[in-house]
A protein has these predicted regions:
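Proteins that catalyze or organize thiol-disulfide redox chemistry
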Residues: 1-30, 35-60, 67-71, 75-83, ...
Length: 115
């Protein structure tokens, strides 16, 4: 079984670890679908890392490279990057697409993840 990284840090998720780290999580999980070639994806990376530190005891903030993990990307219909999906108890409960300011990302964590 895959091991989670330390609380408060970004978790890397793959097609192989998605079920264990996202769907089976007892905490809400925000998954950032991103790609190396995507400038807006890189623009939100620092904010996501900071929010992982801020909310890490209550939620998991994860990153999934869409190019390297096409199964999860297809399964959830991700067509644009970055896409953030919020999961609770294995179900998608919220989403946002595109680069957003840190205040918007924080709002997603507090409202859609119900923190």
């Amino acid at each position: 079984m895959p091991q989670e990284t330390a609380v408060g840090s970004l978790v890397t998720v793959t097609d192989d670890t998605f079920a264990d780290l996202v769907l089976a999580s007892d905490r809400p999980v925000v998954v950032d679908f991103w790609a190396e070639w995507c400038p807006p994806c890189k623009a939100i990376e620092k904010s996501l890392a900071e929010l992982a530190g801020e909310f890490g005891d209550r939620t998991v903030v994860a990153k999934l490279n869409s190019d390297e993990n096409p199964a999860a990307t297809r399964r959830y219909g991700v067509m644009s990057l970055p896409t953030l999906l919020v999961f609770r108890r294995g179900e998608v409960v919220g989403s946002t697409v595109g680069s957003r300011p840190k205040t918007h990302l924080r709002q997603i964590l507090t409202t859609q993840a119900d923190l």
